Amino acid sequence: MRLSMLLVCVVLLGVAQLRLSQASRLELSTAPNLPARVYLFKDNKPFRLGPVDSILPIKVDLFYRDTLWQAVANPKTLEVLAYDQSHVLLLDGAATFELPPGKYRVEATRGLFYEPTSESFELKAGETTKVALRMKRWTEPGQEWISGDDHIHLPRTEANNAVYLKWLQAEDLSVGNFLQLQRQMDAAPQYAVGAAGEAKATGYSIRSGQESRSEPYGHIVMLGGRALVRPLSVGTMYANEPAAYPFPSILFGLGKATGAMTGFAHFHGSMAHSTLPMDLALGNLDFLEVFQFGKLWTAEWYELLNAGFRVTGVAGSDFPVPLGRSLPYPKWLPLLGPERTLVKGKAGASAYDSWAAGVKRGEVVLSNGPVVELKIEGGVAKATGAFFRPMESLRIVRNGKVVATVKGDGTRRKLEAEVAVVPGESAWFAAHGLAKKEEGEPDIQAHTNPVYALVDGRPVRVREAREAYASRWAAEVEYYRGAKLPFANDRQRTEFFAACERALGVLRQ
């Protein structure tokens, strides 16, 4: 019996050694050495890299329970698996893989500011092949940007921080706002909030925040606060009992008391009805998500700017939701921060603090690829737009209307436009650039936040836009009065409708 067992072991060992002798080793790296996201193709078909040190299987559902699994203490690789598509991150810029012999191609991307790169090679049985991917930054020398995604849903423990920070580096995303929310129970929970929950590496931060949701009022976001504001959600759709209180204005006040930046998600909150006009009128908002899922809400954004509301437009992914919106996922787009909130400058000790300061100032560019900038000097508004692919157009917008357009010629990677600032009337200006897109990609574009040219400090106020907002809010108030909102008592109801009327009074001024 022992002899037969020994013979079996010898045979199995021989088979294993034969398999190892037939395998090929790939030593993959980037040059210069930078974390990056990579894709492998064998005979021009997607092929999984392996083995990997850590894996994040994504199942996009309503509860955000996606858990990071690590095989070793300090992973060099992370595989994100979603919708049968494999995305591998070189967390240290280099890793070794065991693969069958054959002809391969590997592609690498890193955020928005590096050109995609690829290398073709052949692996032979029993041999080691070294492949270096040349990473080239396309932005102008000396330009520094702090990039942020205001809307990521991933559960996070303190033990996850090292991998997730390197993931941010592989996507060249300076700031990831990880938002806790609620669906029955807490979803995408964070181990801590405020400074205690901030994970930092040089130039990068992960900061906890929250998304609070309600069916009658919409989805709102609070970033960077020292404490969670509860309840995270109200009403039976997201929580566990009928409720209409607290409404967003109350939550925003509580959030600001913790030092949080406050804003609406999905532009108007993603529900059929929204208190966005009320919260704009009452000055509760620092930002609005205006760029998400490849869509830039330009018409709606321009209208509220014309109505006199100075609020910063930001970009956020709502990760992991975008992974299923376009299949296969476009390799050019980062997984985290496919649309980004860019603040010009260099990150300080906390990348989040530097980024948040820029958002509060309104000095923000929104992009999923190009860089556009606009400045006003000498009575002229001047815009530039650049990308590593050809730029298709660059426009200057004044108070919601296009006042200058420059078209690309199919080859130019940088465009410039300018227009005179008409004296005597307050106005806001912005630049919007479009670049060439590949099959399966959304529009590749960038948009500045408004730059103001005010006369004697008078705000921009376009009568038609202001009246439209007032009318829209009046209609919403009538809806709410007839909706039988489940307030717990008359005090809550009175408080809500008093706020509604205050906002209506402001909008009608």
Model-flagged regions — what are they?
Residues R2-L3, L28:
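Sequence-structural signature of the catalytic-core scaffold of metal-dependent phosphohydrolases
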Residues L18, N33-P46, P51-I55, T67-L89, ...:
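C-terminal functional module detector
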Residues L26, G148, Y204, I220-V221, ...:
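A broad, low-specificity signal marking well-ordered, structured residues that form hydrophobic/aromatic
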Residues E144-G313, S317-R325, A351-Y352:
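Catalytic cores of extracellular degradative/oxidative enzymes
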